[in-house]
From Swiss-Prot:
Gene field: eupC
Domain Fe2OG dioxygenase, first and last residues per copy: 187-284
Pathway: Secondary metabolite biosynthesis; terpenoid biosynthesis
GO molecular function, a single term: dioxygenase activity
Full protein name: 2-oxoglutarate-dependent dioxygenase eupC
Cofactor detail note: Binds 1 Fe(2+) ion per subunit.
Species of provenance: Phoma sp
Length: 313
């Protein structure tokens, strides 16, 4: 049985040198090396020194709380089953997702927002592509504009992260510094507002969200200060490492993760869903981005997975 390792800690990386026009080349290279090392060792790191204003981070969490404070019937008015086609926008109540056989469904509830694609677009209604659903109760609070403003900030931040990751790839792979740019072509960028309510019945099979790997390329997680629960599995010691919450920090995820009331906002870069992603190391492995993500959803999502399974048969 794996246990929590309170001695180890995932790295914290300050990327301010990447954003400063006066930073030395050595300082920039240190950030690149540190990020590359963190991805190899953990697949996770804390990120600080970014240019996201503290008030924007607080506002994202405030929007999270505004939505989940709505009565259940008002949240269900923007239920994910009302989204167009297979766009999967809107509210998911607790009990939708099960990550492993033998576990109970996750207790989390989510509100999903993505890239805004209107009904006239030829791709509207295809997988993870379509218009967002917005609760009318929060219109006067500027909810939609506030959420989309935060999403735009996350897209700019993930571009900075991708550029840094590209510069950290092995020189023998002969990759350019813009090798990840195709991911940002009409990208799938689901952003999930998450609420983990208190677990009233204690059961070893019950989690807010069980251990899993994220489906896409890069995830940016904003956690509420003063909370805990997220852990990273560290294979060398076969132990779970707690992820601390930094007041002005984000958790960046490339790999495995395991997640009182707790709120968080997760931004996922899945990339261009039509892109044929090829392994950069020359191994020949390749996959269509959208097909890979759909298969993972079928494996773990109840209502959403069943819908995808029917449409793919």
């Amino acid at each position: 049985m794996e246990i929590a390792n309170t001695q180890a800690a995932i790295p914290t990386i300050d990327i301010s040198a990447l954003l400063s026009p006066t930073a030395s080349e050595q300082s920039r290279q240190t950030v690149i090396n540190n990020m590359s090392d963190a991805c190899h060792a953990y697949g996770f790191f804390n990120l600080v020194g970014h240019d996201i204003p503290p008030e924007a981070m607080r506002d994202a969490l405030d929007c999270n709380k505004l939505f989940f404070a709505l009565p259940q019937d008002r949240k269900m008015e923007v239920s994910i089953d009302k989204s167009i086609g297979r766009s999967f926008r809107g509210y998911e109540p607790p009990g939708i997702q099960t990550h492993h056989e033998g576990l109970l469904p996750d207790t989390k509830e989510t509100f999903m927002v993505g890239r805004e694609v209107m009904e006239g677009d030829p791709d509207c209604g295809s997988f993870s592509t379509g218009p967002n659903l917005w609760p009318s109760d929060l219109h006067k609070k500027g909810f939609q504009d506030r959420v989309m403003s935060y999403q735009a900030r996350m897209l700019r931040l993930v571009e900075t992260i991708l550029d840094c990751l590209a510069l950290g790839l092995p020189k023998s792979w002969n990759c350019t510094s813009h090798v990840f740019k195709p991911l940002l072509n009409k990208p799938s960028i689901p952003m999930r507002f998450l609420h983990y309510g208190p677990v009233e019945i204690h059961d070893d099979r019950q989690f807010g969200v069980a251990d899993h790997t994220d489906f896409g390329f890069v995830s940016i997680l904003l956690q509420e200060a003063g909370t805990s629960g997220l852990e990273v599995f560290y294979p060398p010691t076969k132990s779970w490492v707690p992820v601390p919450v930094f007041e002005q920090g984000f958790v960046i995820n490339m790999g495995d993760m395991m997640q009182k009331h707790r709120h968080s906002v997760a931004f996922f870069l899945n990339g261009d869903l039509k892109l044929n992603a090829k392994a950069l190391d020359g191994s020949g492995h390749e996959t269509i981005v959208g097909e890979q993500i759909q298969q993972r959803l079928i494996e773990t999502m109840g209502m959403t997975g069943n819908l995808l399974r029917r449409e793919l048969v």
